Amino acid sequence: MLQHSRFLLSALLLMSLAGTVTAQDSAYHPVLSDNFIFSAGAFRSDNTLKIRAEGTLGIGDNVDFGESVGVDRSNTLAYVQLRWKFGSERKWSLTGQYFANDATGDATLKEDVEWQNIVFREGTFVDGGVKFEVARLFLGRSFVKNEQHDFGAGLGIHNLDLSAYIGGEIMINDDTTGYRRENASASQLLPNLGAWYNFSPASRWLLHGRLDWISADLGKVDGTLWNTNVGVNFQAWRHVGFDLSYQYFNLDFVVDKGDWRGGADITYSGPVISVTVNW
């Protein structure tokens, strides 16, 4: 018991000293002045996965993979981000962000589903899955930058990889023709505009927000993208902090590319808990 008490007292003393060092270094959050900020954590996402694959027939409605096919509507994703500030007065920055989702499920269909020239009939047992990867690279410049504030804007690019499938027995006149699985996939680079604002009310606290947006017709792909994050960061030690934020990502597009003619309306949203390291 005495050893536990000593350990707790030592830990409290260490945190107190760490807080003193942070306060002495700057009156405001060190993320605003340091060159590198790395964060890694968990993104607890609620997912809306509505995808359409018309095939060569040019028919088909959006399939809600969560409601119709039983694909997970919520799961925990790995979330990583790195920002590097450089140039005169460190007003330029390069930011990378990555998260991915690989969700599967199965269900007995409550209604007919059309997918890639195939109609899976009501009452058929099907399995399905959606895999989605987002890699973001953003180059920005701060227009208002001091110890307490950082406001900037810039240009970025999102590399998006999306694939989906549905598999099940094909019924013709109450007879099965066997199991069929049909896939749809596409990859696309989407440029975007973006802006951010960071505000430090005190040495340990940072409020931050970011928004990316694009609406464009790129020939084979026509759609709109929103990617935003707002949150708060607590600096526990000089180079380590803890971050709680809310992430919202939405992609709504139509595509006529490769083996996929159709579209999708995909949303990932929810809290992100991460550890930040700055230097």
Where on the chain are the PLM-derived regions?
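Cleavable N-terminal export/targeting peptides
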Residues: 1-34
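Residues on the lipid-exposed face of transmembrane beta-strands in outer-membrane beta-barrel proteins
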Residues: 40-42, 80-84, 137-141, 155-157, ...
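Transmembrane beta-strand segments that form the barrel wall of outer-membrane beta-barrel proteins
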Residues: 206-223
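Repeated loop/turn-to-beta-strand initiation elements of outer-membrane beta-barrel proteins
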Residues: 90-94, 147-149, 203-207, 238-242
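Transmembrane beta-barrel strands of outer-membrane/channel proteins
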Residues: 38-44, 96-100, 141, 153-159, ...
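Short glycine/proline- and aromatic-enriched beta-strand/turn motifs that initiate or cap beta-hairpins
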Residues: 23-101, 276-278
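Outer-membrane beta-barrel proteins
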Residues: 24-29, 81-88, 140-145, 199-203, ...
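Extracellular/periplasm-exposed beta-strand and loop segments of Gram-negative cell-envelope proteins
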Residues: 48-76, 100-133, 160-188, 216-221, ...
